[in-house]
A protein has these predicted regions:
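Outer-membrane beta-barrel channels and translocator barrels
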Residues: 60-64, 97-101, 143-145
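Surface-exposed coil loops of outer-membrane beta-barrel proteins
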Residues: 36-37, 102-167
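Transmembrane beta-strand segments of Gram-negative outer membrane beta-barrel proteins
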Residues: 19-36, 67, 103
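Residues that define the transmembrane beta-barrel architecture of outer-membrane proteins
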Residues: 43-53, 84-90, 130-134, 164-166
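Surface-exposed loop and membrane-interface regions of Gram-negative outer-membrane beta-barrel proteins
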Residues: 67-96, 116-123
Length: 167
């Protein structure tokens, strides 16, 4: 947490020194899914009820470039295992924006993707609880609204216990 605060302080100091645009903001989301059912052998009964807050700050330069630092704060309601928050994750990413193209690299929210995938591929609970992409994404959007998008999510670093995993 101290490292994130230091990075944010340096980012804001550098932005002020070079007279670039500094911004702050936050994203907020909640999730409720009551999966209480009886006599089902496929899945256990349970209820998902959570909230997520992601305060962010960053620098914009040349109108098309952004460097963003955020903290993703997740709280599962009724969670007795954690004293304060259920999960805290960093988001640090570079974003390029133009009228027809966007590119993002780093650790960034899944909400920056244009495509909304069917729950068959990415379940709604999976998308909420795994809302960050660690990798890169790019898309091109035509004037008619059609688009092509590429995203690479590096979910697992190779170690003695795990294999590399990309999605």
């Amino acid at each position: 947490m101290k490292q994130i605060a230091l990075i944010l302080t340096l980012l804001l100091a550098a932005a002020g020194a070079s007279a670039q645009e500094v911004f702050i903001g936050a994203d907020f989301d909640t999730w409720f899914d009551n999966r209480e059912h009886s006599d089902c052998n496929i899945d256990d009964s349970h209820t998902f009820f959570s909230m997520r807050l992601a305060p962010k700050a960053g620098v914009i330069w040349s109108e098309k470039n952004q460097l963003v630092v955020a903290v993703d704060l997740l709280q599962d309601f009724g969670d007795k295992e954690h004293k304060f928050l259920s999960k805290v994750d960093p988001q640090i990413y570079y974003q390029f924006n133009s009228k027809t193209a966007q590119a993002v690299a780093g650790i960034f929210p899944r909400s920056l993707l244009l495509a909304r995938y069917d729950p068959f591929f990415l379940g709604s609970a999976y998308s909420f609880y795994n809302n960050r992409i660690q990798g890169l994404a790019a898309h091109y959007k035509s004037q008619t609204g059609s688009f092509i998008e590429f995203a690479l999510d590096w979910e697992g670093m190779r170690s003695y216990q795990t294999r590399e995993k990309f999605r």
